[in-house]
């Protein structure tokens, strides 16, 4: 892939698409990206870069066939298998092509439109922002890692209401791409699912200008939080913990939070329903509590352990309420100050995450999207209000 990049003429804009076995959906994503580039940036030279993980289903071929005249580089990335390694290849492409700005979009999107490209890259091109995160309507059972930890913890630590810090679609400047490349993280979970939270946290901690782009509904291949999300959770949380240790001097003085500017008018849209099995979540909570019992003794406070164990024994996930959850998360974050084994810490939190998601499903039952969103924001506010507990344990 690097050889192909070296033979390519320089470009002003790059759209990066990481992929692995996405032949069924990536054609539509590529068509939307190429149309978005042509329609919104006709005077600028653009390249679509597909960084693939070695698909055998013809994924890169679908990209080449769907780009509709926009120059395309599609090939296998180097390094550890994972989304972050694909992003690293895209960052390298931005640098090698001497581009000004880049957008990255997921390869399984069914709701992407050409306007997404304009909203992700446009603020960078116009000099209004250095980093753009997505803002979309998601079903109340979708985005559970975001809703329970990535959003409220990022908001409380760094003081910015970035609603989708691990959304998958981003716009960023060439300078930021170079900064990401220079970080010594590519043998860690950042090479996998830790990449999104690494990008957002680094942007916030470095004080660059951040904006959010409203993209409508996100319709993709959703994941059942009970069935699919264990490895993603440990990678995202492990990365969050490592970064919290690195940037402690940045987040410790932060109080409250500020709004982050939104690009595009926010309009009401109805996302596709996402299934989530409370029964499976409670089973995983109970099994995980048994598995992590010794780790809880080492990491969690006595009060937190007692509530968690009782809830697991009785299968009463509703005991994992917002305030209890915020305290438990902060105990794990505080433990990361003196412990490098962030995977162990993330695994200790995983059963409580399953319990919290089961509880949250109950809390939003019968609510529409707006009502569910209020619950998520109330939880984020509780994280802000409980931050002194983290500072006390960190000291």
Report the location of each language-model feature.
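Short, well-formed alpha-helical segments that are part of the catalytic scaffolds
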Residues: 1-4, 22-38
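Terminal low-complexity segments of carbohydrate-biosynthetic enzymes
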Residues: 11, 234-395
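Cell-envelope/extracellular polymer assembly enzymes that use nucleotide-activated donors
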Residues: 12-14, 47, 198
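A conserved acidic beta->alpha catalytic loop
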Residues: 52-60
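Active-site nucleotide-sugar/metal-binding loop of Leloir-type enzymes
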Residues: 64-65, 88-101
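Short beta-strand-to-loop acidic/aromatic patch adjacent to the donor-nucleotide binding site
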Residues: 98-110
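Conserved donor-nucleotide/metal-binding helix-loop-beta segment in metal-dependent transferases, i.e.
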Residues: 113-135
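Short beta-strand-to-loop element that shapes/binds the nucleotide-sugar donor at the catalytic cleft/hinge
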Residues: 132-144, 159
